[in-house]
UniProtKB/Swiss-Prot annotation:
Cofactor note: May bind 1 zinc ion per subunit.
Enzyme Commission numbers on file: 7.4.2.8
Role of this protein: Part of the Sec protein translocase complex. Interacts with the SecYEG preprotein conducting channel. Has a central role in coupling the hydrolysis of ATP to the transfer of proteins into and across the cell membrane, serving both as a receptor for the preprotein-SecB complex and as an ATP-driven molecular motor driving the stepwise translocation of polypeptide chains across the membrane.
PANTHER family: CHLOROPLAST PROTEIN-TRANSPORTING ATPASE, SECA INNER MEMBRANE COMPONENT OF SEC PROTEIN SECRETION SYSTEM
Stated name of the protein: Protein translocase subunit SecA
């Protein structure tokens, strides 16, 4: 109550910010007359003037009014578009590192030009991030005219580009690209063997378009670069025969033994998207696997020799019970292609991890591709948090404002619309069955069609969109289908969706990023005519003019019919996705309407609110085809959505907490790797490693401060001979001197190791040997890092079970991840020392050839795949999902106290007495700083 009272007096935080920015807009508007008088050359010259002022120490904040005024005037001249005042406010929100929520059609692409121009003046690069290559290329080509006019260079970073093209794109003042490609480039830059092979500069400022899609929807999905691992193709095929032989149990057994409606072999938890074998299911699976010869007669699935089979059993079960064709994936050209559950788009090249994809391939009887080993990985959460400044824009962020602030430290500011919205959002209609719901949808579409009103129908899956398309064909209603299967025709379909009598079916937000203009998008159609080389120039001009004349008539006709009507055939589990669908109507003050049609069979209602609503319908004795339309029901659905959103937020937050463990490690390992690349001579590092390993080996057989009776000299001599080809007569030294100490033996071994090392260096020269050492070190770090990632992945699979032992899974994961990491560091030191000490050298040329072979083996991996693997979709338990990113992200640690500005941004200097970033609690110098 107090908060509401204070808001009435002082206004909300959002209102105060907008008011504050409005004052700056007044300052910018006052400069407009003066800027308008400048010639094109003088306007372009302002960029050089601004750059000099920034170089002289003037802040970008102080420069903002002039820079925004110049950018607005340049846009008016080049693009024939002048930024509205509310767009200037949006530009300021982005410059100050916040999220701007702007309604559909308010010109987000144009808004971005203001902060992008201002921040590009500093010369440190600006990244504009979009959700797909089409939007990146469209926006870059569209806005490049403005930036080039102002003297700034623009690069486009697309998947499949050549290395040189990528370097040029990143060297430009402004770089457009997709979130996936920016993330993969960061990972690839940390796998190179030469400094000039990197493409990215330090991560300075990013403007993320559709920020909710990238930072919220895809936050659970790490970017993974992987290579082929061991082949289990035959096992997936044989295991595929198991799920059809098992029956689902209906109901959950309670403590008193009741609750099971129908006994079975496995239970499904749709809410958590998990599948579990029951006791009888285990017995049946074991019996069948024994019959097929996969396990011994009478053996348990949990026997040590069979434990890996459990992975295949559950992968096959999840593939058959939780993942459905044309909903979660499609089969295209003999391959299983994932459908993004948030956008409905096909995710070509992306694969589920943990063997799930292979299990689905076996289920669909297509060629099974080999399992992969993770080479490098990062989550979007941790990638985008590395930027010095981050901003974003979207049409729907306010429902997730808390998460943006909590996870990324980004405040959300709702930007006022340029014209007041006129869209009418009607109450949901809820039917008993899906058939009744679709009958009502068809009636509504027919009514709109007869009145000449365009309709956009949103569905939650490809399967539903094709079902509705079939029903519309039966009803004789012409329509277009816009889903992942028609991706290529997407732009053309969206361009026409606002014409009279046009019916368009879209999965979720397919076509997002393109406005639906009432009367049809004449500009888009004009562009198609312009691009057709077969049409003569005068004919093009005539047709384009005719298009614009027709559009005026159609535009007024559609407005009179009520504008675009949105029909939702199901509620998504996120209110934000529903709001995005609604937001397609009523752009820039146009009329429009929306309504959702639901049935009690919908997953959201069935899981969260079905029983309550069904009892209301039964009590009211509602006849078939009659709908409930009441605020109380709509509110209960929104309450269910809030529960799901809260649960998903908890999953993402938990995932981040696990991922932070490995993220610190990744930063340090990548920092160390970059230092190795840039160092001309790593002798000191190699010497420190050798001394550490030699000391450890000697101490195993001759402990510090021990007496002769405790020594095992013969074993020490054998270890030195086998490991490093050091033939030392230590027993003779002991026999000759009765007073020899453990320290003297260590010194003798150390001296011999140093002499052998120096002899190798002398044969080929310091520079050649140092280059060889660097290659060995990089290849060893990369190989053991990959093995470490696999170990962490294995660790995350079962860490949630520690909760049953009254232990905190996060703390246990942190502790064991550190132990694994420490073991990896020891292995790196031992492996590098072993290779360097054992290498047989005849000539510098031979050494150079060996270094090249090492780099080739490490740097040119065959069958490398770039995955955006959703662990949550793989049906892992919630706690397990959360660990997923941590496991994939721990690409992290060889430690070094040196500082380096690497390709992925400024790496913080770790002081010798600072806590070690690995989380052990020790000082850096006593932990991973030892390596350097």
């Amino acid at each position: 109550m107090t908060t509401g009272f204070l808001q009435k007096i002082f206004g909300s935080r959002n209102q105060r910010l907008v008011k504050q920015y409005q004052k700056t807009v007044t300052t910018i508007n006052a400069l407009e007359t003066q800027i308008e008088k400048l010639t094109d050359d003088q306007l372009r010259g302002k960029t050089d003037e601004f750059r000099q002022r920034v170089a002289a120490g003037e802040s970008l904040d102080k420069l903002l009014p002039e820079a925004f005024a110049v950018c607005r005037e340049a846009s008016r001249r080049v693009l024939k578009m002048r930024h509205f005042d509310v767009q200037m406010i949006g530009g300021m929100v982005l410059h100050y590192g916040k999220i701007a929520e702007m309604r559909t059609g308010e010109g987000k692409t144009l808004v971005a030009t203001l902060p992008v121009y201002l921040n590009a003046l500093a010369g440190r690069g600006v990244h504009v991030v979009t959700v797909n290559d089409y939007l990146a290329q469209r926006d870059a080509e569209w806005m490049a005219r403005l930036y080039n006019f102002l003297g700034l260079s623009v690069g486009i970073n697309l998947s499949g580009m050549e290395h040189d093209q990528k370097q040029q794109a990143y060297a430009a003042d402004i770089t457009y690209g997709t979130n996936n490609e920016f993330g993969f480039d960061y990972l690839r830059d940390n796998m190179v063997y030469e400094t000039d092979a990197r493409v990215q500069r330090a991560l300075n400022f990013a403007v993320v378009d559709e920020v909710d899609s990238i930072l919220i929807d895809e936050a659970r999905t790490p970017l993974i670069i992987s290579g082929q691992a061991e082949d289990h193709t035959e096992l997936y095929v044989r295991m595929n025969a198991l799920p059809p032989l098992l029956e689902r149990q209906i109901g959950e057994e309670k403590a008193d033994g009741t609750g099971v409606e129908k006994p079975g072999d496995y239970t499904l938890d749709e809410k958590a998207r998990q599948v579990f074998l029951t006791e009888s299911g285990h017995e049946k699976a074991e019996r069948l696997l024994a019959e097929w010869g996969l396990i011994g007669e009478g053996e348990s699935l949990y026997a040590p020799q069979n434990i890996t089979l459990m992975h295949h059993v559950y992968a096959a079960l999840r593939a058959h019970t939780l993942f459905h064709k044309d909903q979660h994936y499609v089969v295209q050209n003999g391959e299983v292609v994932i459908v993004d559950e948030f956008t409905g788009r096909l995710m070509a090249g992306r694969r589920w991890s943990d063997g799930l994809h292979q299990a689905v391939e076996a289920k669909e009887h297509v060629k099974i591709q080999s399992e992969n080993q993770t080479l490098a990985s990062i989550t979007f959460q941790n990638y985008f948090r590395m930027y010095a400044k981050l901003a974003g824009m979207t049409g729907t962020a306010d429902t997730e404002a808390y998460e943006f602030n909590e996870i990324y430290g980004l405040e959300t500011v709702v930007i006022p619309t340029n014209r007041p919205p006129k869209r009418i959002d009607k109450q949901d209609q809820i039917y008993k069955t899906a058939k009744e719901r679709y009958d009502a949808v068809i009636r509504d579409i027919r009514d709109c069609y007869e009145r000449g009103q365009p309709v956009l129908v949103g569905t939650t899956s490809i399967e539903n969109s094709e079902l509705l398309s079939h029903l519309l064909k039966q009803a004789g209603l012409p329509h277009e289908v816009l889903n992942a299967k028609q991706h290529e025709r997407e732009a053309a379909i969206v361009a026409e969706a606002g014409r009279p009598k046009r019916v368009t079916i879209a999965t979720n937000m397919a076509g997002r990023g393109t406005d639906i203009v009432l009367g049809g998008n004449a500009e888009k159609q004009a562009a198609f005519i312009e691009a057709d080389e077969a049409i003569p120039a005068d004919e093009k001009a005539r047709r384009i003019q005719q298009l614009h004349d027709e559009w005026e008539t159609l535009h007024e006709q559609v407005k009179a019919a009520g504008g675009l009507h949105i029909i939702g055939t199901e509620r998504h589990e996120s209110r934000r996705i529903d709001n995005q669908l609604r937001g397609r109507a009523g752009r820039q003050g146009d009329p429009g309407s929306s309504r959702f049609y639901l049935s009690l069979d919908d997953p959201l209602l069935r899981i969260f609110a079905g029983d309550r609503v069904r009892s209301i319908m039964d009590r009211l004795k509602m006849p078939e085809g009659e709908a409930i339309e009441a605020g109380i029901v709509t509110r209960s659905i929104e309450s269910a959505q809030r529960k799901v959103e809260a649960r998903n937020f908890d999953i993402r937050k938990q995932l981040l907490e696990y991922d932070d463990v490995s993220n610190d490690q990744r930063k340090v390992i990548y920092q160390q790797r970059n230092e190795l690349l840039e160092a001309h001579d790593i002798t000191e590092t190699i010497t420190a490693m050798r001394h550490g390993v030699v000391t450890e080996v000697v101490r195993q057989f001759v402990p510090e401060g021990s007496i002769e009776e405790q020594w095992d000299v013969p074993e020490l001599e054998e270890a030195l001979r086998n490991d490093w080809q050091l033939d030392l007569a230590i027993q003779e030294m002991v026999n000759e001197s009765s007073s020899i100490t453990a320290e003297e033996i260590l010194d003798a071994v150390m001296t011999a190791a140093d002499e052998q090392y120096e002899a190798k260096v002398a044969m080929v020269g310091r520079e050649s040997f140092s280059a060889f050492e660097r290659s060995v070190m990089l290849q060893t770090v990369d190989r053991l890092w990959r093995e470490h990632l696999a170990a962490l992945d294995h660790l995350r699979q079962g860490i949630h079970l520690r909760g049953y032992a009254q232990k905190n899974p996060k703390q246990e994961y942190k502790r064991e991840a550190f132990e694994l990491f420490a073991a990896m560091l020891e292995a790196i030191k031992q492996e590098v020392t072993r290779v360097v000490m054992n290498v047989q050298i005849q000539s510098p040329e031979q050494l150079e050839q060996a270094a090249e072979q090492i780099e080739e083996r490490g740097g040119h991996l065959e069958n490398v795949e770039y995955q955006h693997a959703d662990y949550a979709e793989a049906g892992a338990p919630v706690a397990n999902v959360a660990v997923a990113a941590a496991a994939t992200a721990t690409a992290d640690m060889v430690g070094s106290a040196m500082t380096h500005s690497g390709p992925g941004g400024e790496m913080p200097k770790v002081g010798r007495n600072d806590p070690c970033p690995c989380g052990s609690g020790k000082k850096y110098k006593q932990c991973h700083g030892k390596l350097s």
